[in-house]
């Protein structure tokens, strides 16, 4: 839903703290919002899973047990067993697929003003990090699925990793294509090690800019206290099929995600700024910690005409199954070849 008042919405549109003169904050939730507050999503609830509805639970939903569909899974070892860092010395960095959703056929969904700014900024920084970037605009679900299936079917042997970014409306466990909602595990499941062997042991990165619900985070004011002044690396080894995933959500489950109509979403602004400044220096988890810090500290919604949406906060949510340190080392400085 995009709650709109004075240019602000919840994907939601927001502004940096200290810039109250530009009230352009909105959210990426579902439904509509009037002066009375957030609207309902209209989503059909999915069945519960013992692992929950978050990223880990959704990945587990896509798992086929050996008893039902056994096959011997073997993939080429691209990194030594106990290497501290991922091998980022392949010929190519890898694919980066950006699904940018601005307009929708679903009547309850408003257009996402500001998303093209996010898309342009993300495209630029990913190219600087040597990704091969492809942008898909306002795709229907069947086209998203076809694109993802094709990407997963390619030979990624000469690539370091793969990255998928989705910018859209959403609810907890769901995200919207142009025409309908879908579960995010419908995307991730194509890239598990048993389904995409050429990406086995390599990072699979997903960045989701969308609401995960309609709850608001009013924040807490922090005040200063008055008193304050690993075996043989050459041997083969097995890995779980769901290893080496990282899923970065713009917000925590159940909550709004804010977007500024002129500068883009808080999360993408922060992610792009950190990738541009530190993408080749810091490892990804350290970098994402600073992304969380930027979103949490530097931004606050400005919707004075809608008091219940005014001065709200946001914090991204990172789910990681990475098994090594990931750093986007400079391709021109890294030696050629693979481990």
UniProtKB/Swiss-Prot annotation:
Effect noted on mutating residue 29 to V: Abolishes binding to Diap2 but has no effect on Drice processing or activity
Family: Belongs to the peptidase C14A family.
Modulation of this protein's activity: Zymogen activated by proteolytic cleavage; cleaved by the initiator caspase Dronc upon apoptosis induction.
SUPFAM superfamilies named in the record: Caspase-like
Catalytic-site annotation from UniProt: 169, 211
Keyword terms: Apoptosis, Hydrolase, Protease, Thiol protease, Zymogen
A biological-process GO annotation: programmed cell death
Sequence segments annotated as region (Disordered): 1-45
PANTHER family: CASPASE, CASPASE-RELATED
Propiece residue ranges: 1-28, 218-230
GO MF terms held by the record: BIR domain binding; cysteine-type endopeptidase activity; ubiquitin protein ligase binding
Protein name stated in the entry: Caspase drICE
């Amino acid at each position: 839903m995009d709650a709109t008042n004075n240019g602000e919405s919840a994907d939601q549109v927001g502004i940096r703290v200290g810039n109250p003169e530009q009230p352009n904050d909105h959210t990426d939730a579902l439904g509509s919002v009037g002066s009375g507050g957030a609207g309902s999503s209209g989503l059909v609830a999915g069945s519960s899973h013992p692992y929950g509805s978050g990223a880990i639970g959704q990945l587990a939903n896509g798992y086929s047990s050996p008893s039902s569909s056994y096959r011997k899974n073997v993939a080429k070892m691209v990194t030594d067993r106990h290497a501290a860092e991922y091998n980022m010395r392949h010929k190519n960095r890898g694919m980066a697929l950006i699904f940018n959703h601005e307009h929708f056929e679903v009547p309850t969904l408003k257009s996402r003003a500001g998303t093209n700014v996010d898309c342009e900024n993300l495209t630029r920084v990913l190219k600087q990090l040597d990704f091969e970037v492809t942008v898909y605009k306002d795709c229907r679900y069947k086209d998203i699925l076809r694109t993802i299936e094709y990407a997963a079917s390619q030979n990624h042997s000469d690539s370091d990793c793969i990255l998928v970014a989705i910018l859209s409306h959403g609810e907890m466990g769901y995200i919207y294509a142009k025409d309908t909602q879908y579960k995010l595990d419908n995307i991730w499941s194509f890239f598990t090690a048993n389904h995409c062997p050429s990406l086995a042991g390599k990072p699979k990165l997903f960045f989701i800019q969308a609401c995960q619900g309609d709850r608001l985070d009013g924040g807490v004011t922090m005040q200063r206290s008055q008193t304050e002044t690993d075996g043989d690396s050459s041997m083969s080894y097995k890995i779980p099929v769901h290893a080496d995933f990282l899923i970065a959500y713009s917000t925590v489950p159940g909550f709004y995600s804010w977007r500024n109509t002129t500068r883009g979403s808080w999360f993408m602004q922060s992610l792009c700024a950190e990738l541009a400044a530190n993408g080749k220096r810091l490892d990804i988890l350290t970098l994402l910690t600073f992304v969380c810090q930027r979103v949490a500290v530097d931004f606050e919604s400005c919707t004075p005409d809608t008091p219940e949406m005014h001065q709200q906060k946001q914090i991204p949510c990172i789910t990681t199954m990475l098994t090594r340190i990931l750093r986007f080392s400079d391709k021109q400085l890294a030696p050629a070849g693979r481990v």
